[in-house]
């Protein structure tokens, strides 16, 4: 029976993606939204890349940890656990199998992940604010974040596909 085992390079790449997701979310183009204390960022674009490159369980770990750490480190601690859950669910939309990052399925996944993001934070804020009305003010900012992250993901993914990235790295080894 063949079992899939991740090599050291896969774990290192997972840690690098977690760190990159954290940095891009917390510090690169970090735009606060005063209405709710949240912020707009492009970390989801890196999350989508991780989800398209890494094996799913490791992409879930990298995305959830990186995004939750950014909330914890930038003063949005109350969102850290919901962020871990929401971002982990977003990763599950993507497929890392195949030789390309940008596929029709992954483009659709970016859109669906955006819906999960907007809906997840609406539900989170509804619980935190004890209201289904007040979180409506955050939806436009979440839509901007989801849309801009999808565009950046597609542009970066196409560039990495042209560089033949997925064929240059081997993230698993087969053991019998």
Report the location of each language-model feature:
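Loop-helix junctions at membrane interfaces
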Residues: 1-176
């Amino acid at each position: 029976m063949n079992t899939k085992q991740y090599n050291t390079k896969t774990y290192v790449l997972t840690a690098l993606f977690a760190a990159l997701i954290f940095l891009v979310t917390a510090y690169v183009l970090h735009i606060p939204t005063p209405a709710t204390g949240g912020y707009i960022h492009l970390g989801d674009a890196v999350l989508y890349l991780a989800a398209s490159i890494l094996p799913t369980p490791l992409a879930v770990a990298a995305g959830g940890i990186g995004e939750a750490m950014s909330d914890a480190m930038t003063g949005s601690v109350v969102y850290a656990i919901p962020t871990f859950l929401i971002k982990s669910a977003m990763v599950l939309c993507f497929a890392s199998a195949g030789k390309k990052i940008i596929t029709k399925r992954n483009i659709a996944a970016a859109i669906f992940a955006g819906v999960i993001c907007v809906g997840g934070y609406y539900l989170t804020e509804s619980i935190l604010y004890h209201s289904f009305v007040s979180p409506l003010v955050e939806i436009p900012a979440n839509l901007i974040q989801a849309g801009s992250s999808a565009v950046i993901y597609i542009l970066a993914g196409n560039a990495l596909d042209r560089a033949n990235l997925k064929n240059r790295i081997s993230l698993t080894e087969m053991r019998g």
